[in-house]
């Protein structure tokens, strides 16, 4: 057995305690051992989360028989009043309203581009020119009515284009065919 002097042990102990005092311990992450563990199994999903009252679960998107369209597609079809408010919003933001229509597929599909992501390969046809001078939602809704009259069995969407950043900022379906 090797003998170690008590002076060497004291030096090691002093260095260890001095080093521990120089650096504050990291307290950002906590050990999971500090969390309470529930021993009983609870199959009632409403008790998992709480907003101060009883949580009611709601199905957000039906998994069968409903195609995904654009922004707001999870809502029922927008009324004329709701469409006017959306158009007023995009005009207020300084975006240029534009109408586009699609005769066959108004939902997400990949035909011209196969990689995942925002771009899904759809090309819509522009209805007339963008409404550069539009100051009121009624002007856009009149164009929407004209497009509906010309192509009643088409998908029609309203987009808001930011000509400074050169990006499309908003897009939503304003009209769907009767069979959708």
Curated annotation (Swiss-Prot):
A Pfam family the protein falls into: RbcS
Listed GO MF terms: ribulose-bisphosphate carboxylase activity
InterPro entries named in the record: RuBisCO_ssu (IPR024681), RuBisCO_ssu_dom (IPR000894), RuBisCO_ssu_N (IPR024680), RuBisCO_ssu_sf (IPR036385)
Primary site of residence: plastid
Gene3D superfamilies associated with the record: Ribulose bisphosphate carboxylase, small subunit
GO biological process: photorespiration; reductive pentose-phosphate cycle
Location of the transit peptide in the chain: 1-56
GO CC annotation: chloroplast
Domain of life: Eukaryota
Keywords annotated in UniProt: Calvin cycle, Carbon dioxide fixation, Chloroplast, Photorespiration, Photosynthesis, Plastid, Transit peptide
Subunit comment: Heterohexadecamer of 8 large and 8 small subunits.
General function of this protein: RuBisCO catalyzes two reactions: the carboxylation of D-ribulose 1,5-bisphosphate, the primary event in carbon dioxide fixation, as well as the oxidative fragmentation of the pentose substrate. Both reactions occur simultaneously and in competition at the same active site. Although the small subunit is not catalytic it is essential for maximal activity.
Name of the molecule in the record: Ribulose bisphosphate carboxylase small subunit, chloroplastic
Organism: Medicago sativa
Lineage of source species: Eukaryota, Viridiplantae, Streptophyta, Embryophyta, Tracheophyta
């Amino acid at each position: 057995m090797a003998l170690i002097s008590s002076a060497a042990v004291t030096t090691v102990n002093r260095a260890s305690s001095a080093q521990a005092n120089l650096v504050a311990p990291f307290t950002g992450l906590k050990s999971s051992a500090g969390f309470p563990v529930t021993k009983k199994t609870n199959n009632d999903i409403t008790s998992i989360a709480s907003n101060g009252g009883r949580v009611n679960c709601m199905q957000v998107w039906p998994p069968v028989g409903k195609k995904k369209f654009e922004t707001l597609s999870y809502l029922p079809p927008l009324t004329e009043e709701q469409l006017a408010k959306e158009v007023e919003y995009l005009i207020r933001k300084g975006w240029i309203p534009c109408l586009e229509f699609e005769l066959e597929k108004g939902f997400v599909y990949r035909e011209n581009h196969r990689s995942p992501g925002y771009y899904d390969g759809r090309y819509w046809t522009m209805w007339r020119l963008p409404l550069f001078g539009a100051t009121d939602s009624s002007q856009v809704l009149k164009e929407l009515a004209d497009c509906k009259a010309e192509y009643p069995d088409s998908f029609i969407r309203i987009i808001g284009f930011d000509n400074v950043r050169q990006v499309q900022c908003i897009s939503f379906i304003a009209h769907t065919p009767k069979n959708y």
